[in-house]
Amino acid sequence: MLLKFLEKIGRKKVVLDRGPSHPKFHEAKPWMNRYYLIFRHRPKWFPFNILIHEKLADDHGEGVHNHTFPNITIILRGGYWETLSTGKFWRPPGYIGFRSANNLHRVDLKPGTKPLTLFISGPFGLRKGPRSEYGIDFKSKKN
């Protein structure tokens, strides 16, 4: 009911699995429904935002990604597999994850599920290094 209300008032965005700069953007498909609880367009000076993410598909490709800000994820429904440099872990409903802006990770879903998370993004500008790495081997740091 809350998600339908947020959609009705213009607080829903369908996020594709790759952006317009990707060489295969023409193959893009819905990856996540994002619902904005506070700001649809957060000002850079504001220290946080609160969103609901309904995941529709695994992270794109074989790579890992990070975020431009530290963040907290609380899994509300479903669950997913998260790959970190320390291994692959099942994240069940109720899991609370704290991530730095530099934390490379990957999310994969169980087939037929649409996990729902509360996502709290922190201040911008704290990431050092690249946005994503494709084909990374966490153990050797080689492609």
Question: What role is predicted for each listed range?
Answer:
Residues 44, 60-67, 84-89, 108-110:
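Short histidine-centered beta-strand/loop micro-motifs
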Residues 18-25, 123, 135-142:
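A glycine-rich, hydrophobic/aromatic-adjacent loop/helix-cap motif
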Residues 49-67, 101-102:
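Conserved short histidine dyad/triad with adjacent acidic residue
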Residues 98, 112-129:
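A short hydrophobic beta-strand segment most commonly corresponding to one strand
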Residues 66-81:
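Short, conserved beta-strand element in jelly-roll/cupin
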Residues 68-70, 107, 133-141:
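Beta-strand-enriched cores of mature, soluble protein domains
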Residues 1-49:
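A short, N-terminal "cap"/entry segment at the start of jelly-roll beta-barrel domains
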Residues 83-106:
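Short acidic-glycine-tyrosine-enriched beta hairpin
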